[in-house]
Regions:
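Active-site bordering "gate/hinge" segments
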Residues: 1-160
Length: 160
């Protein structure tokens, strides 16, 4: 059995409290000037499957999340960034105040950024960017995508 359902069902007040904690923690950091808000959510998906030959089954999947988006301003330059935590189980979420403080840290790190000169440089991707790149690559090398011609590898079929 998959362990993808958390019976914990937070109410609106506890979600509002979690969102407020994330936002307050971010706003408490020097240099953070504004907030686009803290957010907290919970969801449950019920999946039911039935076939014409008599098979039927179902399962539930839950999700919990908390995030904060904040703004910093220095010398007329404004930057915005965020942090979030999501988990199947509420107890696995990062603390709301840690999410808020990390959102503030990420936002402040963007202040004073400048473009690098042209050249060859080693690249380190942020975990959020890396996950997106891996997902895009996985979709491109999927056999069905290649066969449908929707992959950038479509013209490479049969080549080494």
């Amino acid at each position: 059995m998959l362990d993808i359902y958390d019976p914990a069902q937070p109410d609106a007040d506890s979600l509002r409290q979690r969102a407020s904690e994330a936002e307050a923690a971010a706003l408490s950091v020097d240099g953070i000037t504004n907030s686009d808000g803290g957010n907290a959510g919970h969801g449950v998906v019920d999946v039911l499957i039935a076939t014409s030959n008599g098979f039927s089954a179902g399962y539930q999947r839950s999700s919990h999340g908390v995030s904060a988006v904040v703004i910093a301003e220095k010398d007329g330059q404004m930057e915005r960034d965020y942090d979030y935590s999501s988990a199947v189980f509420e107890t696995d979420l990062d603390a709301a105040d840690a999410v808020g403080k990390n959102a503030a840290k990420r936002t402040l790190e963007r202040l004073g950024a400048s473009k690098a000169k042209t050249g060859k440089f080693p690249v380190i991707y942020d975990r959020r960017v890396a996950a997106s790149l891996v997902s895009t690559l996985a979709g491109a090398i999927n056999g069905a995508s290649v066969a449908r011609g929707t992959s950038f590898l479509k013209d490479q079929l049969g080549k080494k």
